[in-house]
Amino acid sequence: STFFNSISSVLGDYYGSIASDVLTTSIKRDKQADLAELRGRRLVIAAETKAGDRLDESTIKRMCSTDKINACKKYKDPFDFTPSHTLVIYTNNLPKVATVDDGTWRRIIVIPFKHKFVGKEDIKNYAEVLVEEAGEYILYWLIEGAKKAIDHGFHVEPPEEVVEAINGYKEQSDTVSLFLSERCDLADKTAKCPSGELYTKYRN
């Protein structure tokens, strides 16, 4: 949270937040008002999805697309806008992804933060300290990074650790393949199992 709190502070009004449940299937309410708050933002952050939450793929695709979004603030007229933001979810519980289609997974990047700051390393309200002492340098770093991304046509090669994290997340999300590899003998071409029994074992 220190990392993203520092960035959001230097971005000012270009930063926006969104409730994490808007990005999951845990709520069924209309999301138009939530999406309306994204207009003009450059960075949108959602924090801490709950264990067991499932990603709402259709909402994610809308938010991470170049297609116009139709939104409406409460008691206001609806309007269209083109997304200009990068969406970030920082959480200890990666939400479940029910689909394995490329349309969803090409939008997902997993960046693991493995280091834990304890004892003297753990500085209270460190984001505020960073912004106060080095806010202009953080903003400069962001601008330089954006320029590099633009220069490379927005195709930036991810580090190996990020690629491994994405692949691991995708494998864990593909529950059918996981079930087949762990519970079924695929080498035995003569093996049979009643479909009802197979489905019950998969569900359990």
Indicate where each model-derived feature is located.
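Feature primarily recognizes SF3-like P-loop helicase cores of small DNA viruses
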Residues: T2-N204
